[in-house]
C-alpha cells in the first residue's frame, strides 16, 4: 500500500543521509507512464488512448496527479512521458506512446512533463520527469523490442527527435536513453546523439 511504500523509502533515505560516509540522499525513480506504478495509486488510460483527446490541459492535470502520488511515496523522479514515435505495428510497446505523429506527441508530452514537474521545484508535490526513450525506439526492426532502428538522419531529426527537442526546450528534468542502436551504435553510447 502507499503508506508502506512511503515508510520503506523514508527509512532508506534516512539511512543514506544519517549512516553513510558522505550522507548523499538517494534519488528514487518510479515508473509513471499513465499512473504511478504502485499499489493503491490512480491508473489512467494508456498514452495511446490519451492521444485521442488532444487535450493539453487534461494531460497537465494528469501529470500533476501522477507526480503527487509518486512524491507522497518518496519518489524524486518519474519515468514518463514516453515520447517514442510508434510506426512499427508489430512492436509490443505501442500503447505506451502517443502514436505516430510527432506534433501530437510533442504537444501532449510537453503538457504531461510540465504537469509532473510543476512550476516550483521542491514543493513536495512534483518531481523530475524522465523523457523516454531517446531515440527512435518506436521503430525496432521486425517489431522486436530493443532491436536496431533503421533510419536516416533526416527522418530521425524531423520526426523522432522532435518531441524530445520540444520537451527539453520546455524544461524537462531528465532523459532516458533507449535500448536500441542506430546505424550500429547503441543509443546509450552514441556520442553524436548524446551531445
For each of these PLM feature ranges, what is it?
Residues 1-195:
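Glycoside hydrolase catalytic-domain context in secreted enzymes
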Amino acid at each position: 500500500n502507499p503508506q508502506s511504500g512511503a515508510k520503506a523509502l523514508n527509512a532508506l533515505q534516512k539511512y543514506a543521509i544519517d549512516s553513510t560516509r558522505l550522507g548523499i540522499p538517494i534519488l528514487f525513480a518510479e515508473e509513471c507512464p499513465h499512473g504511478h506504478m504502485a499499489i493503491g495509486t490512480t491508473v489512467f488510460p494508456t498514452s495511446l488512448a490519451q492521444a485521442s483527446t488532444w487535450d493539453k490541459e487534461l494531460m497537465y492535470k494528469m501529470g500533476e496527479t501522477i507526480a503527487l502520488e509518486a512524491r507522497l511515496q518518496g519518489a524524486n523522479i518519474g519515468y514518463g512521458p514516453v515520447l517514442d514515435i510508434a510506426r512499427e505495428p508489430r512492436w509490443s510497446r505501442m500503447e505506451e506512446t502517443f502514436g505516430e505523429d510527432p506534433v501530437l506527441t510533442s504537444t501532449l508530452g510537453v503538457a504531461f512533463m510540465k504537469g509532473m514537474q510543476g512550476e516550483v521545484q521542491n514543493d513536495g508535490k512534483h518531481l523530475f520527469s524522465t523523457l523516454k526513450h531517446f531515440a527512435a525506439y518506436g521503430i525496432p526492426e521486425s517489431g522486436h523490442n530493443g532491436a536496431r532502428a533503421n533510419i536516416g538522419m533526416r527522418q530521425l531529426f524531423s520526426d523522432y527527435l522532435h518531441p524530445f527537442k520540444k520537451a527539453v526546450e520546455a524544461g524537462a528534468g531528465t532523459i532516458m536513453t533507449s535500448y536500441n542502436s542506430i546505424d550500429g551504435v547503441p543509443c546509450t553510447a552514441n556520442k553524436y546523439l548524446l551531445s
